[in-house]
Amino acid sequence: MEIWINPACSKCRSAVQLLDAEGADYTVRRYLEDVPSEDEIRQVLDRLGLEPWDITRTQEAEAKELGVKEWARDASARDQWIKALAEHPKLIQRPIITADDGTAVVGRTDEAVRDALSR
């Protein structure tokens, strides 16, 4: 199990605390420092069952500068979104937990973190 976090994020800190409280075996990835590649983002999206626009923090200043709210949300624009996430990792929703069964969740709630633990 791996969790992608930004240590400054309260949701990330809460998720880590819950994982610790449950005695989970996991690896922390500080994704702003250890930036995921486009391929890694694709893999996580597949595991999440989501599209890149589903995990993009569209309210971030960088997102507004890029104009992502205006981008198409379909197969033709998928690579554009993934490239933006790789080049601007701050736009990636967090925390993302990759579960041992090959799936992943966006662990913004205790329920989502527990869901990842149960997989």
Curated annotation (Swiss-Prot):
Q: Which InterPro entries match?
A: Arsenate_reductase (IPR006659), Arsenate_reductase-like (IPR006660), Thioredoxin-like_sf (IPR036249)
Where in the chain are disulfide-linked cysteines found? C9-C12
Annotated keywords: Disulfide bond, Oxidoreductase, Redox-active center
Q: Which GO terms describe its molecular function?
A: arsenate reductase (glutaredoxin) activity
The similarity annotation says: Belongs to the ArsC family.
Q: Which PANTHER family match?
A: ARSENATE REDUCTASE
Q: What is this protein's record name?
A: Uncharacterized protein in glnII region
Q: Which organism is it from?
A: Streptomyces viridochromogenes
